[in-house]
Amino acid sequence: MLQTGNYSLVLSLQFLLLSYDLFVNSFSELLRMAPVIQLVLFIIQDIAILFNIIIIFLMFFNTFVFQAGLVNLLFHKFKGTIILTSVYLALSISLHVWVMNVRWKNSSSFSWTNGLQTLFVFQRLAAVLYCYFYKRTAVRLGDPRFYQDSLWLRKEFMQVRR
């Protein structure tokens, strides 16, 4: 079971990684004149998103619901976050690769193709949704019902068996 102190530490780590993601999304364009620094920030951002995915799944594995074999229940409750986080990671990596390819040789020019602008808008839109759904999931996983046997869990188990 996830202890209160451990949960606070994990939640703080998740929010720190989300804050870094927000920081890079907000200020990375200011560093377009320094492509190496921008590349490092992008790599760390993608790793932070990946760490957030790993942390969420570790929190899933730690629940009583998962240990009782109700993986479908967890997936059903949190599938939006799982899918959105995966899409956001793919959009972020795609945007970072495209931006670095366009700007690496000539960082002083302002070159935005229509496709790059479209990808940029979708990545930023996904970033907002990712932050909201990820924070909601992280807080919802603190619910004690997920970590102990309860009447709610028994009802869910009976519905799954039908």
UniProtKB/Swiss-Prot annotation:
Keywords: Cell projection, Cilium, Cilium biogenesis/degradation, Glycoprotein, Membrane, Transmembrane, Transmembrane helix, Vacuole. One of its GO terms (cellular component) is cilium. It is a multi-pass membrane protein. The chain crosses the membrane at residues 7-27, 41-61, 80-100, 115-134. Required for ciliogenesis. Glycans are attached at N6. The keyword Metal-binding does not apply. InterPro entries: TM_138. The gene is Tmem138. The keyword Manganese does not apply. This is Transmembrane protein 138. It is found in: Vacuole membrane; Cell projection, Cilium. Belongs to the TMEM138 family. Pfam families: TMEM138. It comes from the Eukaryota. GO terms for biological process: cilium assembly.
